[in-house]
Amino acid sequence: MAFANLRKVLISDSLDPCCRKILQDGGLQVVEKQNLSKEELIAELQDCEGLIVRSATKVTADVINAAEKLQVVGRAGTGVDNVDLEAATRKGILVMNTPNGNSLSAAELTCGMIMCLARQIPQATASMKDGKWERKKFMGTELNGKTLGILGLGRIGREVATRMQSFGMKTIGYDPIISPEVSASFGVQQLPLEEIWPLCDFITVHTPLLPSTTGLLNDNTFAQCKKGVRVVNCARGGIVDEGALLRALQSGQCAGAALDVFTEEPPRDRALVDHENVISCPHLGASTKEAQSRCGEEIAVQFVDMVKGKSLTGVVNAQALTSAFSPHTKPWIGLAEALGTLMRAWAGSPKGTIQVITQGTSLKNAGNCLSPAVIVGLLKEASKQADVNLVNAKLLVKEAGLNVTTSHSPAAPGEQGFGECLLAVALAGAPYQAVGLVQGTTPVLQGLNGAVFRPEVPLRRDLPLLLFRTQTSDPAMLPTMIGLLAEAGVRLLSYQTSLVSDGETWHVMGISSLLPSLEAWKQHVTEAFQFHF
């Protein structure tokens, strides 16, 4: 499998020693160097296939493009703001994170922030250290009976919910992905955002920073909130519009805010940090010994599992590949690449629409991981993209002038096992269709344009194939073709024919090497092409 040939990994930020040990026990060489400049980082990466970072190292486009051997970047943490995902994807570099490692620590910090907001603990502490005794100034509010709005109900959001419910808080929330039935199972009633704002005494955000979540809390939404609402952001700077938050604090619409993250870190504009009703931390959500150890352990295990071909988890820029490492899917990935390579050789760098069709119950959801493999086969030589792979295939196929669609049909009546994996290429009204399936763990070619092979043709990476179509059954044809092979110094290793379809027969020869030219062949047959994937 691709991405399973790592040899050496650079760890460029401080991580728990368990990370290095797990990598080494998994057979990987490990180099640990911290506080590297961009130039030093590039120099170190010249001999590394893998890179593991936390948040300090900036994996920019310059770094990615200069790191010729780099195949995988692992972020020991959740956010990947410090990795240029577009540049990594374009170069076919896999980016992974550890989505579970920080969850508990971030949730606990959020809960602590809510309690501090309710009782003004940091402000009271500062007052005491200043030699004052101001009991009346720091009148707080109970959490019991208050409503907490949780925006984002993934791992962290649900951990916050269950903890704050123990304080007697009513938890409501919103998440476009998590179903209301699932959130109800951990005690959160989902409502539309416009219904959430006026109900909440406290609001906490736990979403990624996306165009749709940037400025989620803004002047308009603050105006819809209950007067005196308190806001917590331990997720990503920018989800809460900092200018709008400051205005809401100054007007009293917002009674307090607790911020662990900022649009700019560290923030140069100190207006929010210095506001008396703002509690702030220097991005401490993952700063616990347990989270650091867990993140280091998780990213190392993910690297080792990937190298061994066991699994692929935590993928950020190619989520469809997660299933590509399953024992069932692996041979289908090989089949898809083989059919893509066949199509490129047959149709001659096609332009138009590539249709990837899966059939059979076991392939119902496989289209998203099979279509990139088809694209790899189509583009690997035709576009001279030596580094085209399952990560960047969908990006590069658009630049090649191709459109890719996927569809699925159920198994044929009476079909018990795996369905067929089909690929159709439409080219200026001249359809090309190759049909394949997997027998055991071997990809095989079942048919071309309706002509069926019995038995099917094995598709092996070490076996070049020559395919040609004839209209008549000429007894002298096979000796002639073998003679042409001999003239080119190429040996015949296997030979199969299709059943006759519309008066024509497809022939498939396994040969020792690709022929330098097919011109002599085309004088004797209707069409011919060869490929090796």
Swiss-Prot record:
Alphabetical list of InterPro entries matching this protein: ASB_dom_sf (IPR029009), D-isomer_2_OHA_DH_cat_dom (IPR006139), D-isomer_DH_CS (IPR029753), D-isomer_DH_CS1 (IPR029752), D-isomer_DH_NAD-bd (IPR006140), NAD(P)-bd_dom_sf (IPR036291), PGDH (IPR006236), PGDH_ASB_dom (IPR045626)
Which pathway is recorded for this entry? Answer: Amino-acid biosynthesis; L-serine biosynthesis; L-serine from 3-phospho-D-glycerate: step 1/3
Q: Which Gene3D superfamilies match?
A: D-3-phosphoglycerate dehydrogenase, domain 3 (3.30.1330.90), NAD(P)-binding Rossmann-like Domain (3.40.50.720)
Query: PTM Phosphothreonine: at which residues?
Result: 78
Listed EC numbers: 1.1.1.95, 1.1.1.399, 1.1.1.37
Give residue numbers for the modification (Phosphoserine): 14
Q: Which residues carry this modification: N6-acetyllysine?
A: 21, 58
- List ligand-binding residues for NAD(+): 78, 155-156, 175, 207, 234-236, 260, 283-286
The alphabetized UniProt keywords are: Acetylation, Amino-acid biosynthesis, Disease variant, Isopeptide bond, NAD, Oxidoreductase, Phosphoprotein, Serine biosynthesis, Ubl conjugation
As stated in the Swiss-Prot or TrEMBL entry, residues carrying the post-translational modification N-acetylalanine are: 2
Q: Can you tell me which residues form the catalytic site? A: 236, 265, 283
The intrachain disulfides are: none
Effect on the protein of changing residue 135 to W: In PHGDHD; results in a 2-fold decrease in enzyme activity with 3-phosphohydroxypyruvate, but no change in substrate affinity
Q: Where is this cross-link: Glycyl lysine isopeptide (Lys-Gly) (interchain with G-Cter in SUMO1)?
A: 21
Please state which protein family the record places this protein in: Belongs to the D-isomer specific 2-hydroxyacid dehydrogenase family.
Name of the protein described by the UniProt record: D-3-phosphoglycerate dehydrogenase
